[in-house]
Each structure stands twice: as structure tokens, then as C-alpha cells.
Amino acid sequence: MLDVNFFDELRIGLATADDIRQWSHGEVKKPETINYRTLKPEKDGLFCEKIFGPTRDWECYCGKYKRVRFKGIICERCGVEVTRAKVRRERMGHIELAAPVTHIWYFKGVPSRLGYLLDLAPKDLEKVIYFAAYMITKVDTDARHRDLPTLEARIGVEKQQLEDKKNADVEVRQKRLEADLAQLEAEGAKGDARRKVRESAEREMRQLRDRVQRKIDDLDRVFDRFKNMKVQDLEPDELLYRELRDRFGAYFDGGMGAEALQRRLADFDLAAEAESLRETIRSGKGQKKARALKRLKVVSAFLNTRNSPMGMVLDCVPVIPPDLRPMVQLDGGRFATSDLNDLYRRVINRNNRLKRLLDLGAPEIIVNNEKRMLQEAVDALFDNGRRGRPVTGPGNRPLKSLSDMLKGKQGRFRQNLLGKRVDYSGRSVIVVGPQLKLHQCGLPKQMALELFKPFVMKRLVDLNHAQNIKSAKRMVERARPVVWDVLEEVITEHPVLLNRAPTLHRLGIQAFEPQLVEGKAIQIHPLVCTAFNADFDGDQMAVHLPLSAEAQAEARILMLSSNNILSPASGRPLAMPSLDMVTGVFHLSRLAEGALGEGRSFSSVAEAQMAFDAREVALQAKIRVRLRDTTPPSDWVPPADWVTGDVFTLETTFGRCLLNEALPEGYPFINAQLNKKAQAAIVNDLAERYPKIQVAATLDALKSAGFYWATRSGVTVAIEDVVAPPNKAEILDDYEQRADRVQKQFDRGFLSDEERRSELVQIWTEATNKIAEAMEENFPETNPVYVLVNSGAAGNMMQIRQLAGMRGLVSNPKGEIIPRPIKANFREGLTVLEYFISTHGARKGLADTALRTADSGYLTRRLVDVSQDVIVREEDCGTERGILTRIARKGADGVLVRDRYAETSAYARTLASDAIDANGEVIVPAGTDAGDVAISQIIEAGIEQVRVRSALTCESRMGVCAQCYGRSLATGKLVDVGEAVGIVAAQSIGEPGTQLTMRTFHSGGVAGDDITQGLPRVVELFEARSPKGKAPITEVSGRVKIEETEKTFKVVVVPDDGSDEIAYPVSRRSRLRVREGDHIEVGSQIVDGAVDPHEVLRILGPRQVQLHLVDQVQEVYRSQGVSIHDKHIEIIIRQMLKRVNVLESGDTTLLPGELCERARFEAENRRVVETGGQPASARPVLMGITKASLATESWLSAASFQETTRVLTDAAINARSDSLVGLKENVIIGKLIPAGTGISRYRNIRVEPTEEARAAMYSVGAYEDGGVEYGAFGTGSGQAVPLDEFDYRSSGDFR
């Protein structure tokens, strides 16, 4: 087997017949599979043991050799090698074909590679391959030229002979006619009889002349065809071809089928063809030049690689190992087999029949038909259904060919190589575990015992509870009491991974320390539910066990839930108190007027606690408490003589004192009622300023307090708590009358239907809002429903409005708003009509959700694919460039306030240049991480814009550098080298995809003028599609003139430089952004709507199109209230603009019109310029994510994404080499991924001993001059040296 760690590249190429024979362990000659009586493989058949290896370990076919001691012997009786049965997974066979066949991928793919190489149309190629036309493969032009006069003379002689013969025959007939007529006259026959005889004779003579003329014409045609015959001419007329072959067979060769192509390819001069194509490209224009370019790509692919074009025609077919196309016996004694066996059997049957026909010397027509059938059988084996009707099995199901084995979700790539099943894992239903700490999970005992079985068994043997592993295993299976104690010991501090499908982002898998629990359900900490998107209505989760010490260390350090509090998408905490916890804290921090014990003073919190326990003071009563060792609230005004650290008295409640005990020491006292937003702000602040351990502890304390006081608060919802506003009827009456007035105006013809609708919609929207206000005012503050909404625990006012106010307006299936509202609420109940019209919205919601989930998943998959090789490869690329971002804007009072988008643009980035205030003083130097503190300093200094480093301007050749990426949002520190930031970016954009809406909004119910929004808009942007009804942008700067016609506006721009005016026709329905006489700059948008990104790239250049795309994507996410950092979107856009289109190739090896990566283009140009050559020129290209994924340098990654056969065909012809830099390629071949601790700078760390360590080793005599040899993980002999005495030097940061 290949050892994946011993190669750095993987090349794919075209296999020649010799390669196939070299791989093979023998020829498969018979179509038989297994003997149905003995169930043993047939000799020379598709499962033959002699070819593929034994079916049982160390046992030959006939049974002469059994047992491992005969290893490697080949049995002289049956010829089977004695070895392991697993060789049947890797040994191949082959079928020697009686006639060559073409490989369907190269003939039938789009574009047809064979067609491009030979310059034949695919239709003509098909005629040759499937025996419908002859092809001339060779013409001896010199001999033809030499002998042409002789041949022409010979043909002339033949024609003359025919003429002479014709004349003689006609003369003979003429004489016979005269004799006949004389005889008739002598007999005195009538004129009628004489005329008949004459006509008959003339007819015969005419036929004679025609027959000879046809022969002469045929001779001319044959000779003309021969004179003008060229290599690769097709001749569909079989008779003509035979005539040519009989007469001039010495001067040319021709044939049908793959044989003809094979002969043609053998004589094909690649170098000469390439030269003539380059000449055509230099001198040609238009269509001709374009075709020559495409052909040159294929020709130069064969020229530049070791591939031979002969590889596209096969003399033998490989047979894949039998264990990859198994045959298994079912219960009923029948057999189930892989479709491939059927396809192979068809090939073998037809091949054997063809061999027999050739041996018998059968007529050409029969042989050709058999060859055609063999070609079709091989086509079906390689790619069934690519040409003609697919071969079907029982029940008309198309058989799965070799190509189908690779393609799609069930194919080899995605099913078996990128997604494998995992040992040491289990799954179960989840339930909540409120008693757990943030880093813990509850693991059912049975499950833990099964998962940790090997560990428990080893420990039992170590502790002498069992003699050997076998008895230990028996003890575990019988669950002896001692086993549970050992299990408890084994799982201590051994983290497990929990995963909930769908794993939309990296927080879908986190590590926890297991706690054994009774029952069969896994227990989950309530605060990690947000990250997993889990609830307890029957969700299941999978458990995985990290085995090695390194895996455990990584799980504990990188994946432990208490280390993953921040969201990788926005850098803000995800582990927020929610639902009951919010209610509890809200209740705890509430201040109730007139409660028991109001106005009392206490000397300390402890005294207040005693009073509370004695029921003398209520939890929410306003009291005065003297606080010591406490930081006062930020809004507290201290007395004149107060200094920090003094005791102070505060008017607060006992509940708030309890709440503050949950917060870290030294945190400012919180003296306010905390709803969800305020609680989130506190957690946010903690995450920004405190170590993770403390944040986790505080979150746990808040969780416990929340649950405890939510229970004590007694918040429950009864139907009586849903209180409708008492004046609802009056409000409705008022608006009802207004609606009637509008209806009357419409009936009288004062309003159009459109106006009536919009007026009614406006009236009822107003009514709904009025009722919502009345309802809100009507709720008492302690009403449980109101408390739930007010605290932010659950629901919002819109939902409460539907319960207690009125449902309001709904839309119909067309997407228009129905102008009659639903006046009832759910508390009163709806009428039948109201219920009916509201069903549409409800159903659409569910249908939309289902569609969105699939679309969003597909978007995530494409994003991951395009960005999977973006890894932080170096500390700093050293670029000076950056992008300008707005960090502050002027508020209403003219004071600078933080820009609302600074959170997703400037936050967590590295400054590219110093932030300098008006006096020229450096406030924050370049290279600083822009956290909340730095941003506040910059704003206080009156600076509005800063230049920050960005992935868009990073100059790393591969991936990005740590400085340009900035802070890792998930950890809050500068990103580590080796972090797979591309995958994180893709997950951050894809994960909220399900929340985005699907619908296309109608502007005010007008059909047509739709704006694409939500998920489809994000897809449109990332796929770089031209939007429907795109808004034009100006190509020059100048003044605007607007001309109106009946149907359109014409916006004319008069350029400043006096060149020709440019007119932009615009639909009358669009909203103009410019007015007559305005002066506009290049790239200004003329009307509202979506702009074509390709236009932006063409007119304004790459930087502007990057910023435009970031901005547009953010617009969609912001409209749904989703916070994603710009840097994630930038990484995807960097990948979309990675390539350039070569315009002129200069002296480089690049081809004009070729797409190539910018890095390769620049390197090639540098090479040429250094040798004094002419560099190439190119223009940047914006590629959609699907195209960019398929255009990647890695053929493994592209093939596992989409269009597998096309990618592999292309890669094989170009002998593409995959340098295994991305993640997917390495997962596919089973190597460690080059990210995180798998990156070479962490893998190749050598631990050098210090001087003290060397000295300590003298005593053991293990020291040899020339250094110390260490095996893996320092397994040198000698005494153990304390770890902290080792000096790791600068060989890499050892985390």
C-alpha cells in the first residue's frame, strides 16, 4: 500500500496500454464470476483467485497450502499466491481487446478532446468510431504526385475502352435493328409493329450509353476523389471507398472505427500542429483564432507532458479489484452483485465473440458490427448513458458505470473519501443538564463504558483486577461492580467531543469533560445550546472520543466549550443567558415600588440577607446597603471626600446585591434592571476584558441564579394573562369608517383600484399600530406575558399583538397584501374567512424554510470549496497596503460617535498605518489590534477613518498572513499561523443562511419590478452573476442630460473631456438617482437597483468591485439582523479575484485567453523579464465561487466538488500535479490536513536538550559525542528531565 506521508504531490495522467498491462496481475478471459455450486471463483473469470489473490487469508484455491507459514508461495497446482485476502482490494486485472476502442471521456466530453486534437467535428468523429464512415489515415502524396500522369493516362485508356465498347455495342444493336425492320417489311407487317421494334431498340441503346456514361462518371469521381484526397478525409460512401481501395490502395491507407483513429494518432505530428496553430493565432481573427486557441490548449497539453495521444485509444481495458465490485449472497440464496460486473461481462462476451469471428475470417460487415458493439460495451463500462441510451438492468434501471462510482453525493469522493464513519463514537437523545458546569456534559454510564472499553480493560489489568485482556473484557461485558469505579477513574479529565448535525459552523463540535449519569440520554449544558442550535424536543447528538494524548490536548485546549464562548463570525459571545435564565435575572434585578421593607438601611449585604431570610424585606424592595470591597456603579456620583476603595452606601434592592455576587470581583456594581440586551452587554464586556476561565465561571453563576430565581418568580402564562385593550372596538370603528369612505370614493370612480388598495393598506396598518400601542399601555408591568417580552426572554410585541391585539394585514398567494385585515386576535378567535386567508402565509413560511435549508446548505458547500485552501501561512507578508474604513461619524450634536458598522469592519483588525489626530500626534500606532479600547481612543481623538490591513490587500503567495487577517474572532487574539481561516469564513457566511428570507419583494404590489433579496441575492453576488434588470453605471464623468420618450427615459452623460456623449436608456418605472444638470463621477449609479459586478470591475477596477461585493453581501445579512465580520466575506472575494485572463502571451509559456492564477502570471512575467523577454499582459477576472472552485490548481479538490468526469478528463490530459496544499486533497488521500497542528512548522519541531539536561545524561552513559538522538516524543534513554528545563528555541511556537 502507498504510505501517504512519503509523497508531496499526486499526478494524474493518461494510461497507455502498457501501463494497464503493468498494473495487471493477469488477463480476465471468461465472463464467469463464481461457481454457483461451490460458490468459489471461476478460473480466468472476473473473480479469479489466480489473478486477484486468495479469498481466504493464507489459503490457496485448491487447499494444498493453508496457514501463514506458506506465505508468499505460489501453488503449483492452482497458481494462487498464498497471502492475505485483502490483496483482492488492490490487485487489478485486464482484458486484452481484439480490436482497439476509444475512451468515451476524450471523445464525448465537452469539448471533445479527440476532436480538438484531430480538428474533427464530434459528429464526424462519431461516424468513424461507430463504423458509419471511413477515414483516410495516410496518403503517399509523393508517389501519387509522381504517378499521377501514368494513372491519368490509364484512366483515360480505360475510359476510351469503355467508349469503344459502347460504340461497338451500339453499332451491333443498330445492325440488328435494321435486319429486324427489313424482315418485318418483307413479312408486310403493319407500321405499328415496326414502330414498337424501333422504340425497343432505341431504348436498349440509350440504356447502353447511360450505363457506360455512369461508369465513366464513376471513374471520373473516383479519380477526382483520389487526386484531392487528404489525410483525415471522411468517406461515408462504402462503394466509392472500395473502388478507391481496389484501384489506388497502394497510395493511401484508411479504415473505420478506433483502429483508424489509432493509426492516425500514431502518425500525428504534435510539434508541427502546435506551430501551425500558433501561426493561425498570430495572423487569424474572430472565430478562426478562437478555435485555434482552444485546439492549441489540447495540443500543447500533449506536447508539454509525457502523455501520448495514443492513450485515448485503448488496446486493453483494466479490470478493477474484485472487492471493489463485490458479489454477495443474499438470504434467499440469490446473489447481489455490483453493476460493474454486468458491464464487464458484456465487454468480455463481445470481445470473445469478436476474437472467434476474426479467427473464422468472417466477412468485414459482420466483424465491423461486432467491433461497434465492443466499442459500445466499453463506453457503457466507462460512462454509461454518455452516448445513446444507457444500458439498463432489471426494472429498467441504468447500470452504474465507473464514472457513476465517482460522481455525486454517493460517489467515491464524497461518500467514502471525504466522509467516513468513525469508530469510538455513539449517539443518543439530549436532555438539559442545569447542574453542569460550562465545560461538562452528562454521559450515560452504558455509553461511557462502551466508548472507554479499551481504556477500562487496560486499567483493570494494571490494577490486577484481571489477569489478562481477555478476562478484563469479560468483566466489562458482565458489568462487574469494580468496572464502574475503574470507568470513573478512566474518564477523569479525558474530554469527549459532542456533535450535533447539521454541523453548520465549527461550534457544532465541542469538547466536554464527561460526568457519568444514570439513564440513556446525554446531558447538555444550557448555555451551549445556542452554538449547537440544539433544543430538547428530541434532538440527538453524537459523541466521539479523542484517543491519543495529542488529540486529547487539542480537544482540551482548542475545543473545550469554555474556550469557545465567542462566535467565530462576529467575535461576540454566543454563550448568552436565554429564556428562563433571562427571566430569572430580570426578576432578580427588578425594583418594585412599595414592597415589604422599603426604605430600610443595612450595614452590609450579610445583614440584608438575614432580613430577607427572616421575611422582613422583599427581594425587590428599595433599600439602602453599605457596600465594602466593591467597585461603585459607573453612574454613581461619589461624595467630595470619597476615594477609591472606601465604603459607600447605595440605594438598591437585595436582589441586585445577590446578582452582583455572581459577577467577578472588582466588576462595577450593577444597579439596574437587566433585560436580555443588558445581560448580553455585560457578557460582552466580560469576554473583552477578563480571562476565559473567569468568563465561564461568571456565566455558570448567572445561569444558576437565573434558573433559581426564574423558578421563584412564578412567571407562568394563563389565558387570562393575554389581556386585550378595552378600547379595541372604538379604535376599529374609527378606522372602519375611514375605510368605508375610501371604498365609496372608489365606487364613485374618484380612485383607481391601485390607489384604493394602497390607501386601505395604509389605513389598516395604522389601525394595527394604534391597537398595538393601546395593548402595550394596557398591560400591567407584572403581567407574565409582558414580563417575558419585556425581559427579552421570549417572543416580541408583534407576536403579542397577534395574541391580544389584532392580527392585521396578511398577503395572498401572489405576494400582494390583502386590503381587508384580520381584526380578531387569537385570544378571541378568528372567523372562518379570517382563518382561511391566514393559512397561505403560514404554509408559505413552512415551505420556504424547507427550501431555504437546502439552498443554504449548497451555498455553504460551494463557499467551503472555494476557500478551503486559505490558511494563515505566515506571520506577516510585509505589505504597506490596506483598506480605508470608517470608524466614526458625527452624531446629531456634532460629536463623533462610533460608526454602527465599525463592529464588522474595523473591529478586530490590525491597523495598516498610524492613527494620527489633527495635531499630527500618533494616537494608535500601525500594527496595533483594533479592539474596543483602541477604537474608543481613536474616536476620542476625533479621527473618522483608519486604514486597516485586509485579506484583500494581503500579498502572501498562498493563503493569507496573520497581520492582514487580524484578530481571530473566536479567540480574541491575533490569529495563529496554521488557522484554516477560509473554512471559518465559509461557515460564518453559510451558517446564518437559513435565517435569510427566500422571497423576492414586490415593490408596492407592482408586478415585474422585483428586487432580489435574502439568500438568492447572496448567491447572485458570490456567483458573480449579472443581476436581472441591472442598473447601469457611468463609464465617464460629466454632466447629466435627461431626455424623455413615451416608453423610456434616456440619461445622456456629456463627458468633461469633450469626447462623444454616452446615452443610457432607462425604463420609466425605475427611480432615477440623478437630476438634469448634475455632475457625476465615473462609476456613478444612474437608477436604483442592483449593479453588475463585472461592469464595476471593468470601469472602476478590482479594488472597487471588492468593496462593492463586501458591501452588498453585508446589506443582506444586516437586513436580517445577522452580524458577520467583513473579513470573512473578503476572504471569499479574494478567492473570486485570484485569476487573470491572459490577453497577449509575450514570450511566456502562457496561452492567450488562458485563465491563470495571478501568482503564477506574475512569476512567469518575472522570469521572462529577467531573461530580457517580452512579458505577458492580462486583465483581472471576477469568477463566481462555483467556477473558481472548479478552476483551482488542485484537481483532487475540483473533482470532489462537481463535474467530476470533466475535471478528471482535463487533469489527465494536462498531466496535472496536485501539490496537496488545501485541506480537501489531504483528507481525500488520508494525510494530516495542513492546518492547525498539522502544518509543517508545528509537525517538524525537534526538542533540543539544554546544557543541564546534557549534564544529567552523563550519569546514564547515554550521551554520545555529536548530539543526542531522540525518537518520537523524546523517547531517548536517560533520566526524565522536567519539561520546563527544555529550551524550545525558535524552531516554532510550541503551543
UniProtKB/Swiss-Prot annotation:
Residues reported to bind Zn(2+) 2: 877, 954, 961, 964
Cited Gene3D superfamilies: 1.10.132.30, 1.10.150.390, 1.10.1790.20, 1.10.40.90, 2.40.40.20, 2.40.50.100, RNA polymerase II, clamp domain, RNA polymerase Rpb1, domain 3
Secretion signal, residue range per the UniProt entry: none
UniProt cofactor(s): Mg(2+); Zn(2+)
Pfam families membership: RNA_pol_Rpb1_1 (PF04997), RNA_pol_Rpb1_2 (PF00623), RNA_pol_Rpb1_3 (PF04983), RNA_pol_Rpb1_4 (PF05000), RNA_pol_Rpb1_5 (PF04998)
Residues annotated as binding Zn(2+) 1: 60, 62, 75, 78
GO BP terms in the entry: DNA-templated transcription
Coiled-coil annotated spans: none
Any one Gene Ontology cellular component term annotated for this protein: DNA-directed RNA polymerase complex
GO molecular function annotation: DNA binding; DNA-directed RNA polymerase activity; magnesium ion binding; zinc ion binding
Keyword Amino-acid biosynthesis: no
Positions bound to Mg(2+): 535, 537, 539
Keyword Zinc: yes
Keyword list, A-Z: DNA-directed RNA polymerase, Magnesium, Metal-binding, Nucleotidyltransferase, Transcription, Transferase, Zinc
Reaction(s) catalysed by this chain's protein: RNA(n) + a ribonucleoside 5'-triphosphate = RNA(n+1) + diphosphate
Superkingdom in the source lineage: Bacteria
EC numbers: 2.7.7.6
Cofactor: binding details: Binds 1 Mg(2+) ion per subunit.
Subunit structure comment from the entry: The RNAP catalytic core consists of 2 alpha, 1 beta, 1 beta' and 1 omega subunit. When a sigma factor is associated with the core the holoenzyme is formed, which can initiate transcription.
Purpose: DNA-dependent RNA polymerase catalyzes the transcription of DNA into RNA using the four ribonucleoside triphosphates as substrates.
Assigned protein family: Belongs to the RNA polymerase beta' chain family.
Record's protein name: DNA-directed RNA polymerase subunit beta'
